[in-house]
Structures are given as structure tokens and as C-alpha cells.
């Protein structure tokens, strides 16, 4: 059972259970035993649940799954958001809408995974609970803030795990852990019962070993709830079906550096060039071209919106409690204080900066179908690189290489994915980042499946 998910993805395991080649209880018990063993070295799972109800008869019937400690609630359990201040948060009285859909799809929720405090850092090293370790090398971070899910999936403890993304937090850990991770379009998966996150920048989905698992899970969880502020356009068919057809000849643009950013490490430039060549060999039209927008203004707007949301979310969740010394990590405290001071004028101008950038990206995608880069502007992420201390400017400088390619997708709501088809000379995964126009997840899934066939990654494991 230890190697079950090294050999089978989630859909395959569900089929084995459905055809009685494996028992659901056998899979659950064996998986839990393996997760406990792996977690001793990875520190990826914060809480194990032993009260999972019987699995529903859905496409993932009987497959164990984990939920990140952020942006999602599980009935009967607290959501800590990776913070000491919320360690004793009241238990949720109901599942979030997306979690309820996951259960209806047959997933068995067996625990919660680690995150940075409030998801503010693109790493997973919270003071509350401690750092999660990248299974590829124990001095490296798996990235974040969905690093708990990414680490346990990369270690083959599970075939996929829940992840959220407010600036890259699905794609960054997917890139650093050799996984597939797609951030859906704004409004594709409901965030109910909350209204929105980060002025529409927040999204949720999963990190996975296979492309088809991600697509099938999006089929199961996509769709709006009554009153949702956003709703993505309906796809032409199922996302799983998109993985079974050729993507056609796509117009692919690639960049060698972030918009407004510094030159990349030559290792990353070579990875981009190799991927561009592969895409040409697969029949796509490839050229070097970059969208044009004010990256500095977007970054400033992002931090203002994040700060305001952090302050408000602390107040809403605290229910009158006031954080004392040490209750919040230093950077979280500074971000919250900055958020409290932001004016309505500053906030509205920041939202307008999001929309200006969205229009610029929309114009770019009139001429191109896909934008290619690396997922992050680093080759790896040693533990301790993105510390939650010092000034906010210093923290921003530490974060910038991690989100240089990813955050714009959150600000504009477009779908994007990290695909593990490149590797460094020392054998570490390099995620390649692909962005498409709003609502075009089908394009990304068709391309991802083509790349998965051309450059298989499943057997490359820690």
C-alpha cells in the first residue's frame, strides 16, 4: 500500500475500489498509516481526521484527500489559517461549498495540511506548527503557501491534495515539488460561504501527480453558488474530455524575464528555451513576446489589497479578541497594521490597477493563446529564504522572485498552470508556467496532457 499512489493516480484507485480489486477500508487504513509515517519527516499534515463519513459514489469514490488550513472549512473541525492566534478557533458548523462538492465526488477527507500564516508567504514555514520539508531535499522548502499538500503528494502519500492560490500558492509549490498545479479562472470554483478573497485574486483547486486527476476534480467542483460575485464562463465540455483531445496549433508566446523584473538565472532561461523548442516540435507556433503592463504599480496594488484583507480577516475571525505579543508573526502584524491604515481611495485605486492589468492581458491574448515562462524566478528555495521578519519592504524583496510570473494571473483572474517538464542539473524539478485567456482552462488541460505524454514526469520522484 505504501506505493499505491506511485503506481496509480486518483481516478485509477477509485476504479480499483469500484471494481472491488481493492477495498475502500483497505485503501483508507493503508494510506493513513503511510501518511503518519511520511509526516514524521515532512511535517506536511497538521491534523488527521478519523471521523470521515462513508465515501460518496462519485468519480473519486474512496480516494483519501487532504484540505489546506486556509480558504476552506471542514464541518466539525477548526480552520487555523496557519496562525497561533487562531489555534483554538471554533469548529466549522458546515463544509465550505467546494469541500462539500469534493465529498460528493467521493473523496475521503483525512486531514488538513500546513500553510504559511494567512498564506502571506510563498513558503510553508509557519511559527505555529513549524516548517514543511520538501521531499526532494530536506534543506529545501516545498514552496507555499500550499506546501503541506504539495510535499505529501510529491512523496506519493496521496495522488492529489487541496491547494489555494492568492498569488501563486498552487503553482509555486507544484513547481518546486515536481507536480501539476492549475489555478482556475476567477469564479470557476466557488469560495462560498465567503464573498471573495483579495478583490477576486483568490482561487482554490489542487496539486496532483496527473493532469487528468486535476481535470476530473475541476469537473466535480466547478460552478457558482447562489449569490457568488463572480462566475467563470461555462466550458464547451468537460475538463477531463479536454485532456483526451489534441490542443490544436496554439499561438505560444514566451518570455525570458518577468515584466519589469530582473534577468533570470541561465538555468531557467535554458529551461524556457528547451520548452519553447518542444512546443515547436509539437506543432505550435512559438515566438518571443511579452504582455505590457506596469508591474511596479501592480505589485504596490497587490500589497495594499492583501494588507487590507489581512486586517479585515483578522477582525472578522477574532470576534472581538485582540492579538497579543507573539500571537501573530512579525510580518503578519506589520501587514495587518498597514491594512488598517489604507484609505478607501487607496483601495479603490488598487482594484482599478488590477482591472487595468486585466485589460492589458486581455489584449495580449487576442494575439496569443498561451504565455510561457518558468513558474518562479528561482532555481530552488532553501528553508529560511522567505522569513516572516524585518520590514515589509525587505519581505517584499524576498517574495518578489517567487511571484514574479504568478501573481499577475491572480490580479487578472486568468487561468494558469505549472507543469513539471524541466529539471535542474542536480535533479530538482523546474516548473514551467503556462497562462491562457480568462475561461480557457480547456486549452491549458489539452496542452498539459500533450506535454505529459511528450515528457512524462510520474516516474521522476524524490
Question: Which residues make up each language-model segment?
Answer:
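Short, gly/Ser/Thr-rich active-site loops of penicillin-recognizing serine hydrolases
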Residues: 345, 444-462
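Short helix-loop capping/hinge segments that flank enzyme active sites or metal/cofactor-binding pockets
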Residues: 60-84, 244-256, 305-362, 374-378, ...
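Acyltransferase
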Residues: 24-29, 96, 238-241, 264-291, ...
Amino acid at each position: 500500500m505504501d506505493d499505491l499512489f506511485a503506481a496509480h493516480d486518483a481516478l485509477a484507485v477509485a476504479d480499483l475500489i469500484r471494481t472491488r480489486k481493492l477495498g475502500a477500508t483497505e485503501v483508507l487504513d493503508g494510506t493513513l498509516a503511510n501518511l503518519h509515517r511520511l509526516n514524521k519527516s515532512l511535517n506536511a499534515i497538521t491534523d488527521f481526521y478519523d471521523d470521515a463519513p462513508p465515501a460518496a459514489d462519485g468519480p473519486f469514490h474512496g480516494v483519501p484527500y487532504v484540505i489546506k488550513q486556509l480558504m476552506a472549512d471542514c464541518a466539525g473541525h477548526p480552520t487555523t489559517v496557519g496562525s497561533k492566534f487562531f489555534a483554538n478557533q471554533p469548529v466549522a458548523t458546515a463544509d465550505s461549498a467546494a469541500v462539500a462538492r469534493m465529498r460528493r465526488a467521493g473523496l475521503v477527507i483525512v486531514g488538513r495540511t500546513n500553510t504559511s500564516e494567512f498564506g502571506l508567504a510563498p513558503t510553508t514555514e509557519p511559527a505555529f506548527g513549524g516548517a514543511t520539508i520538501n521531499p526532494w531535499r530536506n534543506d529545501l522548502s516545498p514552496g507555499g503557501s500550499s506546501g503541506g499538500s504539495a510535499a505529501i503528494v510529491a512523496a506519493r502519500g496521496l495522488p492529489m491534495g487541496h491547494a489555494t492560490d492568492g498569488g501563486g500558492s498552487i503553482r509555486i509549490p507544484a513547481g518546486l515539488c515536481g507536480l501539476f498545479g492549475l489555478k482556475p479562472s476567477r469564479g470557476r470554483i466557488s469560495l462560498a460561504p465567503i464573498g471573495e478573497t483579495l478583490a477576486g485574486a483568490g482561487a482554490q483547486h489542487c496539486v496532483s501527480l496527473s493532469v487528468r486527476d486535476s481535470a476530473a476534480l475541476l469537473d466535480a467542483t466547478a460552478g457558482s453558488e447562489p449569490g457568488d460575485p463572480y462566475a467563470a464562463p461555462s466550458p464547451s465540455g468537460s475538463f477531463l474530455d479536454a485532456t483526451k483531445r489534441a490542443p490544436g496549433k496554439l499561438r505560444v508566446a514566451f518570455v525570458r524575464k518577468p515584466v519589469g523584473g530582473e534577468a533570470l538565472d541561465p538555468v531557467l532561461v535554458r529551461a524556457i528555451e528547451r520548452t519553447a523548442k518542444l512546443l515547436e516540435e509539437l506543432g505550435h507556433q512559438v515566438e518571443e513576446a511579452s504582455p505590457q503592463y506596469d508591474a511596479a504599480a501592480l505589485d504596490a496594488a497587490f500589497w495594499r489589497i492583501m494588507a487590507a484583507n489581512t486586517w479585515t480577516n483578522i477582525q472578522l475571525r477574532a470576534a472581538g479578541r485582540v492579538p497579543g505579543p507573539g500571537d501573530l508573526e512579525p510580518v503578519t502584524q506589520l501587514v495587518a497594521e498597514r491594512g488598517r491604515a489604507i484609505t478607501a481611495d487607496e483601495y479603490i485605486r488598487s482594484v482599478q490597477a488590477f482591472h487595468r492589468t486585466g485589460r492589458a492581458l486581455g489584449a495580449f491574448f487576442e494575439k496569443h493563446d498561451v504565455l510561457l515562462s518558468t513558474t518562479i524566478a528561482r532555481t530552488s528555495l532553501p528553508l529560511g529564504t522567505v522569513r516572516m521578519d524585518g520590514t515589509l519592504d525587505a519581505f517584499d524583496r524576498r517574495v518578489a522572485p517567487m511571484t514574479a510570473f504568478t501573481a499577475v494571473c491572480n490580479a487578472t483572474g486568468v487561468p494558469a498552470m505549472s507543469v513539471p517538464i524541466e529539471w535542474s542539473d542536480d535533479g530538482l524539478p523546474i516548473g514551467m508556467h503556462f497562462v491562457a485567456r480568462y475561461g480557457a482552462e480547456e486549452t491549458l488541460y489539452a496542452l498539459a496532457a500533450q506535454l505529459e505524454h511528450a515528457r512524462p514526469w510520474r516516474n521522476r520522484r524524490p
